[in-house]
């Protein structure tokens, strides 16, 4: 009977440690690094740069609910501007941009254009 209790306690302890470890590993693959005026600045891991769902979640977290919002995304923190206007290099390094206007209901996520994208396509150039 005592061995069963020890086994149950050990199993619970192991399950708790594993749950805590998996939570620590499941860190978001983006970070809100600041703002310039009303523009929110977010860095994403390169592998997440084209993940629309993740980018929308990051934008929702960075924006104030019910307010107009622009979120600019980079995959390299070294390219995030510290002032406006941003340089051409910083602008080219942007991987996505999210825009929300709650008055009109407009909401748009533009991803970086793939090379060879048609000129009229809706993407971040």
Predicted feature residues:
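Generic preference for hydrophobic/aromatic residues in regular secondary structure cores
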Residues: 2, 32, 71, 96-101
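Short N-terminal segments immediately surrounding and downstream of signal-peptide cleavage
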Residues: 26-43
């Amino acid at each position: 009977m005592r061995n069963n209790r020890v086994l149950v306690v050990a199993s619970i302890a192991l399950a708790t440690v594993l749950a805590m470890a998996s939570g620590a590993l499941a860190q978001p693959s983006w970070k809100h690094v600041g703002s310039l005026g009303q523009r929110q600045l977010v860095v994403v891991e390169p592998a997440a740069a084209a993940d629309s769902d993740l980018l929308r979640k990051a934008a929702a977290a960075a924006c104030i609910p019910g307010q107009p919002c622009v979120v600019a995304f980079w995959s390299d923190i070294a390219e995030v501007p510290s002032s406006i206007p941003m340089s051409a290099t910083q602008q080219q390094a942007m991987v996505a941009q999210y825009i929300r206007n709650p008055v009109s209901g407009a909401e748009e996520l533009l991803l970086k254009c793939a090379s060879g994208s048609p000129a009229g396509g809706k993407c971040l150039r």
